[in-house]
């Protein structure tokens, strides 16, 4: 009986207000902990406090690995943004080299996420032109694959990369292995001119052309706003590509100095004798290097001139932006092939 009364009093005491007396300190609770002491050091288990930050080289490699292998779209995009920031510094922070970066990131040209593709485009623009020019052949392979992708958005984004590549390394694009013929094949497929190519090939072989199905019909935008804009961009990109390919080579002033330079000066390109294909596999016509303007004019006139001329006739019928782009392409053809007959004769 006594214990129950004592417990009731203790419970009741918790709800009673303590009367404070003047000059007497407030009673401390039973769980009070004295924190008035001062410590000279704080020891945290399994942790270290250091002034030095993460290793910049390892951090760069970590984000490069995230950008190329992460399954998360947000992680890939954010990693590309970090790499773009590092490459945009003055001087650029590129500890692994441009070839290593491109080898890991070029497959992202056909990434399914538009944010990743946009960020990759910004990263490519951060590279100096001198770093891009020796890597044009590798870049062109992925760009050609993206330009013939099933997704229209991926084709449009890849076309932006092609436009940028023509700006920074146009002469290398048209003169690398497969850069002339394979790129023309891709433009023909993108513009819907594959049926014209097949018909011309059948006519040259002397066989009757096959009936065209709905999959091989010439491309038409039917007045669609987005489709018309994309079609016009493709025509203008093709015009830019042909303008660079038909551009006359710069000629020196001649003289004794030019002769000595041609004999003893070190080449500026990474593979100056690549057009000879001394140690590579045999190339077909599409994979060949067309290093000078005359070779490009010759093969274009034989295989592509009639195809593009017929495709332009269909493009001009649409008018608007497509018609104007077709006029630019038509003028490029006239200027580029104006002196071709003179060279042949």
Curated annotation (Swiss-Prot):
Subunit record text: Component of the RIX1 complex, composed of IPI1, RIX1/IPI2 and IPI3 in a 1:2:2 stoichiometry. The complex interacts (via RIX1) with MDN1 (via its hexameric AAA ATPase ring) and the pre-60S ribosome particles.
This protein's UniProt keywords: Nucleus, Ribosome biogenesis, rRNA processing
Any one GO CC term of the record: nucleus
Segments traversing the membrane: none
Disulfide feature: none
Gene: IPI1
Location(s), subcellular: Nucleus
SUPFAM superfamilies per UniProt: ARM repeat
One Pfam family, short name: Ipi1_N
BP GO terms, sorted: rRNA processing
Biased composition range(s): Basic residues: 1-11
Family: Belongs to the IPI1/TEX10 family.
Region (Disordered): 1-29
Function per UniProt: Component of the RIX1 complex required for processing of ITS2 sequences from 35S pre-rRNA.
Record PANTHER family: REGULATOR OF MICROTUBULE DYNAMICS PROTEIN, TESTIS-EXPRESSED PROTEIN 10
Gene3D superfamilies (UniProt xref): Leucine-rich Repeat Variant
InterPro entries, A to Z: ARM-like, ARM-type_fold, Ipi1_N
Organism: Pyricularia oryzae (strain 70-15 / ATCC MYA-4617 / FGSC 8958)
Record keyword Thylakoid present: no
Top-level taxon in the UniProt lineage: Eukaryota
Record's protein name: Pre-rRNA-processing protein IPI1
